[in-house]
């Protein structure tokens, strides 16, 4: 699941994914966070 959160590294996505979907799992793809359920 892509969320509207710009990133430079995958670590930036973890708190964003935690807030968005309740799970701190994801990575940075094309400067956007992708979260995994």
From Swiss-Prot:
<dbReference type="InterPro" id="IPR001947">
    <property type="entry name" value="Scorpion_toxinS_K_inh"/>
</dbReference>
<dbReference type="GO" id="GO:0044564">
    <property type="term" value="P:envenomation resulting in occlusion of the pore of voltage-gated potassium channel in another organism"/>
</dbReference>
<keyword id="KW-1221">Calcium-activated potassium channel impairing toxin</keyword>
<feature type="site" description="Aromatic residue of the functional dyad, important for the interaction with Kv1.2/KCNA2 channel">
    <location>
        <position position="36"/>
    </location>
</feature>
<keyword id="KW-1220">Voltage-gated potassium channel impairing toxin</keyword>
<comment type="function">
    <text>Reversible blocker of voltage-gated potassium channel Kv1.2/KCNA2 (Kd=65 nM) and calcium-activated potassium channels KCa2.2/KCNN2 (Kd=575 nM) and KCa3.1/KCNN4 (Kd=59 nM).</text>
</comment>
<keyword id="KW-0872">Ion channel impairing toxin</keyword>
<keyword id="KW-0632">Potassium channel impairing toxin</keyword>
<comment type="similarity">
    <text>Belongs to the short scorpion toxin superfamily. Potassium channel inhibitor family. Alpha-KTx 04 subfamily.</text>
</comment>
<dbReference type="GO" id="GO:0005576">
    <property type="term" value="C:extracellular region"/>
</dbReference>
<keyword id="KW-1015">Disulfide bond</keyword>
<dbReference type="Pfam" id="PF00451">
    <property type="entry name" value="Toxin_2"/>
</dbReference>
<feature type="disulfide bond">
    <location>
        <begin position="17"/>
        <end position="35"/>
    </location>
</feature>
<feature type="site" description="Basic residue of the functional dyad, important for the interaction with Kv1.2/KCNA2 channel">
    <location>
        <position position="27"/>
    </location>
</feature>
<feature type="disulfide bond">
    <location>
        <begin position="13"/>
        <end position="33"/>
    </location>
</feature>
<dbReference type="InterPro" id="IPR036574">
    <property type="entry name" value="Scorpion_toxin-like_sf"/>
</dbReference>
<dbReference type="GO" id="GO:0019870">
    <property type="term" value="F:potassium channel inhibitor activity"/>
</dbReference>
<protein>
    <recommendedName>
        <fullName>Potassium channel toxin alpha-KTx 4.8</fullName>
    </recommendedName>
</protein>
<keyword id="KW-0800">Toxin</keyword>
<keyword id="KW-0964">Secreted</keyword>
<dbReference type="GO" id="GO:0140629">
    <property type="term" value="F:small conductance calcium-activated potassium channel inhibitor activity"/>
</dbReference>
<dbReference type="GO" id="GO:0090729">
    <property type="term" value="F:toxin activity"/>
</dbReference>
């Amino acid at each position: 699941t892509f969320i509207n959160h710009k990133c430079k590294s995958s670590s930036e996505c973890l708190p964003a994914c935690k807030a968005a979907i309740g799970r701190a799992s994801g990575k940075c793809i094309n400067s956007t966070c992708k979260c995994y359920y």
